[in-house]
Amino acid sequence: MAGSSEGNSVAYRIVLLSSISGAACIFFFSRLTIQISEYILGHPGIGLKQDSGLSLMSGGLGGLLLGFSDSFWRNCTEAEVYSLTGCFFAATLYFGWRYFVEGNTRYFLLSCFLIGAGLCVHPTQILVLPLIIGIHLFRQYPVLVKQIAKGILIWLILNLILGYWLTEGLVFVGLQMDLILAGHSGMGLPPGYGLLLVWLLSLFGFLIIFCLSNKKISHWLGLGLLHAGLAFYCLIPLRTDSPMQLGAGKDAGSFYAYFTRAEFGKPPGIYGPSYMQNTRPSVQSSWHWDAIRNHYARIKKKEKEVEDPQGWFPRMYSSAHAEAYNQWRLDQGYTIETPPTWKENLWFFLSEQSVHYFVRYLGWNFIGRTNDSPESQVLSVNSFEDFFSFGNKRRVNYHFLPLLLLILGIPSVFFFTQKVPLFWIIGFLITGPLLVWVLNMTPDQVRERDYVFQLCMVFCFLLAALSPISLCYGLNFRAKNTMRFLSALLFITPAIQLIEGWSSHDNSKNYSALNFSEILLASCPSQSVLITAGDNDTFPLWCTQQVYGFRPDVTILNLNLLHQPWYYRRLEMPGQIGQFQLKHPLPDSLDYKPILHVEGSAMERMDSLLRSKNWSAPLVWTRYEFILASILTDMEKFEPNRSVVFSPLLPTQKILYMRAETRLNGIGRVLNFNPDTALRIHPAKHFKSILAQSGRWNPENLNHIERSFHKLIRKKGLMHATAHENPDAIIRYLGWLDQSAPPDQLAGVIPQNLAYARLLDSCGQTKQMTEFLASLSLQAVERAKVSAFPEDYCREIEEIESMIRLQHPRFKFSESWFNQDPAYPCAGH
């Protein structure tokens, strides 16, 4: 549907595919609800006759509740894969339930094929595999139902083997075969044939066993059809021929990285590192096809390897999110001086990962949300303003009606039959709590992750859809007039969902992305080069240029994509919008290892900064500064008449050394090349300085400098001081940093400030420590004078004072600073 390359039709077809997939998901979910309702009503213990009207009511109610829910509705209006994922998931559940109840093998085989095909859309489709395996064991081996322990063990083993084979093992074996056939063996086959051979052997191997087997043939045929569903992956090499391609899987190496989602990494599960543990660099490698030399090349990638000891149940593991972990631990009353214990990790899993992510997403769909921002909270019944106010289009208020239906549907699922509870519990646990544990999500997610739990929403709305059965059973409703009244009463809930969610999901007049793109492109001089850094200031601009034909003369260069070979090929293609050719090509390995790496102590770099106080260049040279310097060098030498425009979303630190030479034009910062400008910013000089320092400075040490500049420098300095490298140099460096930093950068940094004070005290510099803490108290007092919440700063002052008195009981602050100051807001506190 989305295969056309004609401007507007591409976007239209992609959105249409998402909408049609959502409609198909609702259809299969409604059919699943009707089938389960008929099964429950046909049970002799319920005492209700098998009424088709009641089943249809449950199916219609379930489809409307799911369709108008916050997360599902949002997925249907976006050009993403999650709507199509939900379609495959609902269809697999429907045919799996039919097999569970009726025992018809064709439904099992169709479910296996849909699992394989759904994996090609999104890897979360693997979550339905344990449910189908459990249903198959229940049908084929009824004795395992009585031998519960043996049945659970066999179920777990099958899930581990098939789950690994489908998500990684198949492609890994294919990569090894590809290295033999297309690698250095001299056979000269194109890349990918080894992977294709392994897939064909797996497919036809199971089918041959099926033909030769005399009993239990559904096992082998199901495995064969599951592999046949994976054939949809053959579309990936075809669809990645577009000019703009990300993660093209054209060979076994890159396809293995795509298939295993290597860019997202693998978070630890049961046993792993803590975010506070020391790390040492390790070199890992991956295989990528070298089209020039016509063979596979091993690309080395420097990564972090955690030193022992490690811990159990690691939930706080990411060193990049240390500040968020520390803040959470302080809020919970824990100390941040030692690594988190397994009890702290368990509480973080329950309170943050389970409640803040998973339960909060459920609350958005069954209760409502305070606003439409990613930080939105669930509506609280204790807040009169949130719950009973009307007219706020950003607020979504379902008045607890979907939650009430969910609670009413619990008896229908658990009290009448045995198969329905088993079906629901396995599906909910795997797509909900177990997924929370496996993902091990870090704080401050880039975008909302509620789409990950979309599959769990299906089981939750299944409970709500079965609420009519509970009401009919509990209130003994049998009359037709009563049924009509009940249906009208129940369908008020999806109507409220529709009314409340319309303003949040109606994109008919939402042109914010187009308007932003036009404003930013209009801010660029003719034939200029626009430097961008993210998705939001790149893809909408490409769409505006290529689809709407607005300002095609501007060349858009994305720093995050310039290290991709396909992006270079696109920029150099004749007739392309924004054609650009880089005269200084970057190394092929730029995508897989840092350009600059420190081998020695970081003290040398800190001391040099301390002596020179030279901020003319970025503090850390990452590959992005490397790319930017090479672009500016090229333009200064070969295209001096073209202007460079920096996107407003580009982090300031990336252009710190040339910011004074830019001027604000519209919403972009324009850099015009002329003799004076070139003399001051010296792009070629900076480019050479990077090459000269290659192998000396590791950008991974400060990879989040853009987010928290001074806090991060302070934290890294304290880490080196703890290792007893050179505490005196750290003290001098941090002292210089405090003097050069703006006051607002140091406000309220209690953990870092107290750690700095302990560092001073450990070095025997008690006087400097007390002076530093006293100055912090004075800063807190000044902020408290003008703050609407002075008690927050009073607590900060008390914490500082208690820290000093803990180490120096006789120490007292000068009374002239506090008690004699009539403006002191904490007097007598």
Please tell me what each predicted stretch does.
Residues I34-G42, F72, T77-A79, S83-G86, ...:
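ER/secretory pathway lumenal C-terminal domains and tails of membrane proteins involved
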Residues G59-G67, I115, L119:
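Short helix- or helix-capping micro-motifs
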